[in-house]
Amino acid sequence: MMTMLIISAILAVLYTGAAIWRNRCLPDSVSAMVYDLPKSGKYLWTVWLWTVTELICPPLFETIPEDYGVLAHCFVTCMMFTGAMPLVKGEKNKAHNALGITAGIFSQICVAIIDAQWLGLWALFVFIMGSVYVQPEGELGRAVKGKGVFVAEAVCWLSVMGSLIFK
């Protein structure tokens, strides 16, 4: 199970790192980059998101108490549909955003059930996003300005991975 989480983490870091390197800045969100890709790239992005999500499934369903399995299933389902949405509709759309938000909410409910201390990572979100207001001309302030969705997605992902790896 740990191997699956490590592979998922490597794939997520490689994709995000490549996107940051390609654009020379943080993306607006993890999925924002898919809309700049050609059609074949959208298929690749969907396969990437599905792979990262499916590699999390066995450890997630093994770790979460049986009574709450439906919440984990809702999280995984929302992630899968979020990955497929760019193929269904070519442009940014409300369904994609709603599914992403719902996946984030379900992921944090799962984290609260598995190991609630990982929800403390949201303090990191407040610190990072607060830097935009405290030092807007500072290096961190300039880097994250307008990137709140990406930072929130990163915190969701880190809390899920942390709760699964260290449980």
Where are the model-predicted features located?
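Hydrophobic cores of alpha-helical transmembrane segments in multi-pass inner/ER membrane proteins
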Residues: A9-G17, T46-C57, I105-D115, V126-I128, ...
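Terminal transmembrane helical module of multi-pass membrane proteins
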Residues: D115-K167
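Helix-coil boundary and interhelical linker segments in multi-pass alpha-helical membrane proteins
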Residues: M1-L5, C57-V70, I109-L121, I165-K167
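Membrane-proximal helix-loop-helix units in multi-pass membrane proteins
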Residues: G69-F125
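Transmembrane alpha-helical segments that form the membrane-embedded catalytic/substrate-channel core
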Residues: V13-R22, F81-L87, M129-Q135
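Membrane-interface helix-boundary motifs at transmembrane edges
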Residues: V34-P38, F61-Y68, K89-A95, E137-G148
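N-terminal topogenic module of multi-pass integral membrane proteins
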Residues: M1-P65
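Physicochemical signature of membrane-embedded alpha-helices that form the seven-helix bundle of GPCRs
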Residues: M4-I7, W45-T53, Y68-C74, H96-A103, ...
